[in-house]
A protein has these predicted regions:
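Positively charged n-region of N-terminal signal peptides that target proteins for export
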Residues: 1-8
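Bacterial N-terminal signal peptides
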Residues: 8-17
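Protease-domain processing segments flanking chymotrypsin-fold serine proteases, especially trypsin-like
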Residues: 22-108
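Conserved catalytic-core segment of clan PA serine endopeptidases
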Residues: 71-99, 107-108, 128, 132-182
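Catalytic histidine site
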Residues: 81-140, 222-232, 240, 263, ...
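Chymotrypsin/trypsin-fold serine protease catalytic domain
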Residues: 151, 166-240
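Catalytic nucleophile loop of clan PA
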Residues: 242-261
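C-terminal cap/linker of serine protease catalytic domains
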Residues: 265-292
Length: 292
């Protein structure tokens, strides 16, 4: 059984333990946000942010052979408010009346407003969309140096939203303007890559919040591609990483571009993080988010 780095529901478990689904012809699913920006900002008090919870961890093994992970892991040492660290941030949202945390990355787009994250950070997969969706770039110890940005549209793959297919666990959240400015005009934006060679050296970013981490600092893992998950189709990619719940949606960067996001792990594969391969379906999600 897989371990998610954010919300897990019974429906999610059922979806993940079933056979892999093909990506549907209608590749994109989205939800327009009706709650006002001011209402979402007011909702996310310092106390609610502090008490929002990270992953629920599933127990049990997997059908994948356990791997020995070789990787580096460390707290980001530089300034959070200087590009490119300023593009990484903490995500807050509500599902089923419970407040959760994820991670995300501001990426370049035509509307200058897209946060790239995991599908399960916007939708139960399958199930409801998140509410009160907010992104705090350069979050550190409760500080919000660039303010709280709220979503106007949440976009994910229909394979995730309708089937819970982990191979398509990606999403783009389109942000409202803040102080009259678009997101990447303020914090900058990473590039984003699709249909690439899998064999890369990845630098993964996130805000792990389950023990031994606190979710208050940006964390980094560095690893070559370690493995692929044969239980998924297309196969997801695995790297060495010890990040825990709350890091979901954090970007895996190669050069200056996001190649995938933190998605899940297995209980019998310690220190291995998986992320979807960003092919044409992920590109469709990005294109839809970029034009909203």
């Amino acid at each position: 059984m897989k371990i998610f780095t954010a919300l897990l529901s019974l429906a999610l478990f059922l979806a993940l333990t079933s056979v892999a689904f093909a990506a549907p012809a209608d590749r994109v699913d989205l939800k327009r946000v009706t709650k006002s920006r001011a209402a979402v900002v007011d909702y996310w008090t310092a106390e609610r942010m502090r008490n929002a919870i990270p992953a629920e961890r599933a127990q049990g093994g997997s059908s994948s052979k356990a791997q020995r992970a070789a990787f580096s892991s460390y707290e980001y040492p530089g300034s959070y408010t200087t590009f490119p660290a300023s593009t990484h941030g903490k995500v807050f949202f509500t599902l089923g009346g419970v407040n959760y945390v994820c991670s995300g990355t501001a990426v370049n787009s035509s509307n200058r407003s897209v946060v790239w994250t995991a599908g399960h950070c916007v939708n139960e997969g399958p199930g409801a969309y998140a509410t009160n969706w907010a992104f705090v770039p350069a979050y550190r110890d409760g500080s919000r140096p660039f303010g709280t940005w709220t979503a106007r549209t949440l976009v994910t793959s229909s394979a995730w939203a309708n089937q819970g297919n982990i191979s398509y666990d990606v999403a783009g959240a389109v942000m409202n303007t803040h102080g009259g400015s678009a997101l990447t005009d303020v914090v900058g934006g990473r590039g984003i890559a699709f249909n690439y060679n899998r064999n890369q050296f990845f630098t993964s970013f996130g805000y792990p919040a389950a023990p031994p981490f606190t979710g208050q600092r940006l964390w980094v893992c560095e690893s070559n591609l370690l493995t692929s998950d044969p239980t998924t189709s297309p196969q997801t990619m695995g790297i060495g990483c010890d990040m825990t719940g709350g890091s979901s949606g954090g970007g895996w960067v190669v050069g200056s571009s996001v190649y995938t996001v933190n998605s899940y792990g297995y209980s019998n594969q310690r220190n291995v993080m998986y992320g979807p391969y960003q092919g044409s379906v992920a590109q469709s999600v990005y294109n839809a988010a970029s034009t909203r």
